[in-house]
């Protein structure tokens, strides 16, 4: 059934009443993380997922001549390549860690560089500057790597007195994605990072009969990992239904 918003048009209680005995949550991570710096609401600043979605839907996009992409994942490299293909004269990715810590797949990074995308490592934005309501530049600071953080990567630390400005007319924000889980009933527990908690063996959530998999559980990952989670959950759901006599 299409055109249905779970949590608005129907909820889990309604699904149980309709006779469903198991639910699988696979909503992905389609909510963009927000960059909490000044100037994020200027014209010419767009989230990478919104940008890629619009391009994929065939919408006409106004592409700047000089584009900066902020982030270091596969979405950042996809957005950078897309902007270049759509006519941008110069596209630069700003990433706050080193090449070794970059979460994007190595081949994605190589493809972007081969197509002409420039990558500046150990650089973070401090402020997005604008003129007449439109982005005109990004004030940046150079970083150095410190001790390992909770992600297992070395923590980027701003270098005092290293601020500089990059002029551009478009900023694409690709600093991460998260699942939109506002529709979930309170009985379903979340992990510390805001994803759905599941039993790693059965993929069942804290609510009996409800399973989950893919990016909604792991955070942004690969299609292969999502397919694997789906297969694992399907087996568990089958076993669960058999236990009910279904």
Positions of PLM-derived features:
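Mid-to-C-terminal Rossmann-like scaffold of FAD/NAD(P)H-dependent oxidoreductases
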Residues: 110-116, 121-136, 144-146, 239-246
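Rossmann-like dinucleotide-binding cores of NAD(P)H-dependent redox enzymes
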Residues: 1, 55, 80-127
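Generic hydrophobic/aromatic pocket-lining and core-packing "Φ" positions
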Residues: 12, 80-81, 223
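Feature captures the FAD/FMN-dependent oxidoreductase FAD-binding
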Residues: 1-38, 127-139, 144-147, 168-172, ...
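Rossmann-like NAD(P)H-binding beta-loop-alpha module
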Residues: 59-89
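Cofactor-binding loop segments of dinucleotide-utilizing enzymes, especially the Rossmann-like FAD-
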Residues: 72, 95-98, 215
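A conserved FAD-binding loop/helix module that cradles the flavin
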Residues: 216-244
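FAD-site-proximal beta/loop scaffold in flavoenzymes
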Residues: 41-64, 149-220
